[in-house]
Amino acid sequence: MIYLHIGGGVGDLDSSTNYRDGFSEFVKSKNDKNKKIFIVEANPANIKKLKRSWKNFKNVKIINIAITKNNVGKKIFYYSEKDAPHYQLFSSKKTCYETLSRFYN
């Protein structure tokens, strides 16, 4: 079985979600030794915790990229340090980021 999670965040290590993540819970509960897991996360600030979340699973590939409808090469993303340490607010559109970041002021 192949599992793909787009937008992995920090997996099940986010205290703001009570350390729960539906994808992580579902996949980790499956007793399938042949499963392959691909997790895509655009925010590099989340990768270290995401790797820690999946450290006991050998068939996991964590990919630090953003997925877009067009091949745009490098892209600037906006996030707020006030949203640390899990950075739920993350956008490629500055106007969207500015609107949402008001919740953290």
Language model features: what each stretch is:
Residues 1-105:
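Phosphate/nucleotide-binding beta-alpha loop and adjacent structural elements of enzyme active sites
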